[in-house]
């Protein structure tokens, strides 16, 4: 009887888990504010509304592999199943490899006589996978892209978009005369803006091997040549990330976004850096809701100076009629 009950409990747990997954997949808008701007934070395992900051799901289980790989060869070697097509690998993940286990299909050990031949086959198979200059370029560039995206904590969708942008740049021969690292960084910056999870040029440059000036110049070039239509970044897009870094509540996040929307309606954000406006709005919101953070703390997270925050928050308070008691 005890065994039957255990089996039944496991079945109930599986059913509950299945329903939870179905419920999450059915969520298309925020149940709190009705916004469709939902984003999954893989680093913290959360499903979040970008507008009001509601955490819709905070126990997201990563369905990916339990192992880590630092290049495509290592990834292929450790994988136990066929992967889906992806633009983040130079051959889109369609090629195969000869395993190093030295065993045949039935699990029997390969004879000593045939191992030397198998070694040569592996060597040539690796060479065939990257057979020309374009493939070598893609292999290096996409591994660099993966490294930077991991360091920045970007989701898979942004990596795929950045890989597609880079591939288009290669097809149109826009790489000539420019460093691969610079074009990769520019493609990643464009993908972040396109996906609504912006990173500043300074943040991209921190993890890139090129400076901020080159990334900006290359970004303007590829967006013009590829005809990418990218809307200006809204300060509100930075709020969820800054809020999380400062340990502020969802109420503060909601209030900061509300302040930014009012500022945009009155055109107070025109000609001003979005990170500076976002930092100032967050600083004001934290004071209004009793979760005060210092200007230095906010400045460090936002990557701006304390002077910028002081100028922006005074401007917002004056033009929007917000009374701040310091």
From Swiss-Prot:
- Tell me which domain of life the UniProt entry assigns to the organism this sequence originates from: Archaea
Source organism phylogeny: Archaea, Methanobacteriati, Methanobacteriota, Archaeoglobi, Archaeoglobales
A GO cellular component entry from the record: transcription preinitiation complex
Stretches annotated zinc finger (TFIIB-type): 26-57
Keywords per UniProt: Metal-binding, Repeat, Transcription, Transcription regulation, Zinc, Zinc-finger
One GO BP annotation is:
transcription preinitiation complex assembly
Q: What is this protein called?
A: Transcription initiation factor IIB
Write down the Pfam families for this protein, in alphabetical order: TFIIB, Zn_Ribbon_TF
**Function, in words:** Stabilizes TBP binding to an archaeal box-A promoter. Also responsible for recruiting RNA polymerase II to the pre-initiation complex (DNA-TBP-TFIIB).
Matching entries from PROSITE patterns are given as: TFIIB, ZF_TFIIB
**Organism per entry:** Archaeoglobus fulgidus (strain ATCC 49558 / DSM 4304 / JCM 9628 / NBRC 100126 / VC-16)
- Gene Ontology molecular functions: DNA-binding transcription factor activity; TBP-class protein binding; zinc ion binding
Show the InterPro entries listed in the entry.
Cyclin-like_dom, Cyclin-like_sf, TFIIB, TFIIB_arc, TFIIB_CS, TFIIB_cyclin, Znf_TFIIB
Residues at which Zn(2+) binds: 30, 33, 49, 52
